[in-house]
């Protein structure tokens, strides 16, 4: 794999985002590798737990804006739609996989990556972590199941406010709202993880598989209908002038001038 690192440590599969030169921005190849790694971990009977973390100063900015700029300039709507489909599938996979999925967040996590953190069963954050629904900044709406996941985690009103303002949610506030399991200093993050794994290793993997299925069936029965709506909206938004303006403005380091078209 070129864009992530996949390794095994006893019963733990570790997926590390490894594009720090672009702040671990998601593009099609990396998304496909994440799905491949998740499938490897899911199908390996020796793996009982999955950890997703990242190299670099930030966890991820979400979508790769350099790639978005290329797609906008070339009017490449299919690739933009493909990314939206892939990140949605990753969140869906995290929720469906019959093993506990942990995510370690240090620094900013934005866009689709922030929503994958919500999808994880346990999010461990450093005190420097910030969770950002950055989509409105480029004229989009949340993807990777964002509103579906957030509204069920923190309530409809808070989910809407985060999505509409794009405000950064601190690690402490995320902990208070229940989005984060534990917050620690960066140098203590690994210890926090090991404490959690020690606790999780006390129970049967069959229990975790059953619990995840029960949680899913009780709260996410309408996912497919939601995912279809989300993808169609994202495809439509990706064709707007405001989206093109948002991406170009970000690339040019200026404030976007949205016109509602």
UniProtKB/Swiss-Prot annotation:
UniProt keyword terms in alphabetical order: Fatty acid metabolism, Isomerase, Lipid metabolism
Superkingdom of the organism of origin: Bacteria
Pathway stated in the Swiss-Prot or TrEMBL entry: Lipid metabolism; fatty acid biosynthesis
Function: Catalyzes the isomerization of trans-2-decenoyl-ACP to cis-3-decenoyl-ACP. Most active with 10-carbon enoyl-ACP. Can also use 12-carbon enoyl-ACP as substrate, but not 14- and 16-carbon enoyl-ACP.
Subunit: Homotetramer.
Recorded family membership: Belongs to the enoyl-CoA hydratase/isomerase family.
Protein name (database record): Trans-2-decenoyl-[acyl-carrier-protein] isomerase
Gene of this entry: fabM
């Amino acid at each position: 794999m070129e864009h992530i690192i996949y390794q095994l440590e006893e019963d733990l599969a570790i997926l590390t985002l490894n594009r720090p030169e672009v702040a671990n921005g998601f593009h099609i190849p990396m998304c496909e590798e994440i799905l491949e790694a998740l499938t490897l971990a899911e199908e390996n009977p020796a793996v009982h737990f999955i950890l997703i973390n990242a190299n670099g100063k930030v966890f991820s900015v979400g979508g790769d804006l350099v790639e978005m700029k290329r797609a906008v300039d070339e009017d490449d709507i299919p690739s933009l739609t493909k990314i939206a489909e892939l990140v949605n599938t990753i969140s869906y996979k995290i929720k469906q996989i019959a093993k506990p999925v942990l995510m370690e967040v240090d620094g900013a996590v934005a866009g689709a990556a922030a929503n994958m953190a919500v999808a994880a069963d346990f999010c461990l954050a450093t005190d420097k972590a910030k969770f950002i629904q950055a989509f409105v900044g480029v004229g989009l709406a949340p993807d990777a199941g964002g509103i579906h996941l957030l509204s069920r985690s923190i309530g409809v009103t808070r989910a809407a406010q985060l999505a509409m303002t794009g405000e950064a949610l601190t690690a402490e506030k995320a902990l208070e709202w229940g989005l984060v399991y534990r917050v620690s200093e960066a140098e203590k993050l690994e210890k926090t993880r090991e404490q959690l794994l020690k606790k999780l290793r006390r129970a049967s993997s069959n229990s975790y598989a059953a619990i995840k299925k029960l949680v899913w069936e009780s709260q996410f029965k309408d996912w497919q209908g939601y995912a279809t709506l989300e993808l169609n909206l994202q495809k439509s938004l990706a064709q707007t002038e405001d989206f093109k303006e948002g991406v170009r403005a970000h690339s040019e380091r200026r404030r976007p001038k949205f016109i509602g078209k």
